[in-house]
Amino acid sequence: QYTEFGRQHNFKDVRLLDDFKQRVPVSEYEDLKPYIQRMMDGEDNILWNTPIRWFAKSSGTTSAKSKFIPISDESLKDGHYKASKDVITMYYIRNPESELLTGKSLVLGGSHQINMVNEEIQFGDLSAVVLQNSPFWSSWMRTPDLSIALMDEWEEKIEKLATSTINENVTSMAGVPTWTLVLLKRILEITGKDTISEVWPNLELYLHGGVSFVPYREQFEKIIGKPIAYLESYN
């Protein structure tokens, strides 16, 4: 009710779900685009009542053009980062003897280039926004270094990912299956090992998402060389 969108739709009078349904029509991206553009121009209190300084750029799968999704501090803290804690908690409930937090998580996202709209507003892939704003304590458990994780040139990135992580105690991995397989194969080439479990003997969890894991599961089981847990996540 403290935003322009809220005032236009009388949010102050909303008490029940039916009130909201009556006042707010189903909106597509094109309906919200003018509001989002104003937010990208630096205006506050348009769709959200705290400053928005980050936008996630979609891949444009439903139209020819990419979409820009406002990312608030609240959505990062109470959504993405809270969900990460929930996943770890649920994993430990199922696996109370886990040694997951004794090592590091190898995080492999998509293209991570960060772009500036102006001095205050930035945009990038969601994975880039989440990594760039991640709480300080997450760096204790994550590999590689953020400067490598945020690289945009994939061939160089895979090489640096491989060389910088082969001597780490990696206990979990997170990323899309396609690029993760490319990385794991490169690590075996560099080390001369037959399986990833020889490189990272304490690896116990792979968090995957983005595409169906069914076509990749057998390849992962073979290249890792020992049973581990597989969990699908989506944000």
List PLM regions with ranges:
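Nucleotide 5′-phosphate-binding alpha/beta core
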Residues: Q1-K57, S63-L205, V214-E218
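Conserved AMP-binding/adenylate-forming
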Residues: P201-N235
